[in-house]
Amino acid sequence: MVVERHNDWFRAPVKRHTTASEFNIDNIAALPQVDIVYSHGNVQPTAVQALVASGAKAIIHAGTGNGSVADRMVKPLQEAQAKGVVIVRSSRVPYGFVLRNAEQPDDKYDWVVAHDMRPEKARILTMLALAQGADTKTLQRMFWEY
C-alpha cells in the first residue's frame, strides 16, 4: 500500500524473481526467437506457419478464457512442435489462470501452460529458459515458480 509516497508491504512475494531467480543474463549471449499468436474468432493457422518458417523456437498461444485453442489451431501447433517449436498456452484476458489439462490435454500434447502469466511476460520467461537449454518439463516448472 502507498500512503503519502511511502510504501508499506504486508505480504512477501511468493514467486521467485530478480536476484532470487536462476537466470544470469551475463551468461546469455543471445535470446531465441519466441513469438506470440493471439487467438480470435475465425483464427487461421497462417501466423503459426509463418513464425515457424521464420525460425521461431517457441510460440506463445494467447487464447481466450483458460488459454483456449481453437480446434482448427491444434494441428498447426502440433506440426510446429514436431519441428522443434515449444508451445506455451497463455490467455489474452487480463485475470485468471491457464489450468494445465483443463482446456487442452497439455500432458498428451507436451504443451506448457503459462499459469498466471500474460502472453508478454510468458514470452520473456520462455526466451530466458530456452537460452539456458530448458526442455518443456523444466519450462513448466519455471512457470509454476516465477
Identify the residue ranges that each predicted region occupies.
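Accessory alpha-helical/coil subdomains and C-terminal extensions
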Residues: 1-67, 145-146
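C-terminal non-catalytic interaction/assembly regions of soluble proteins
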Residues: 50, 63-146
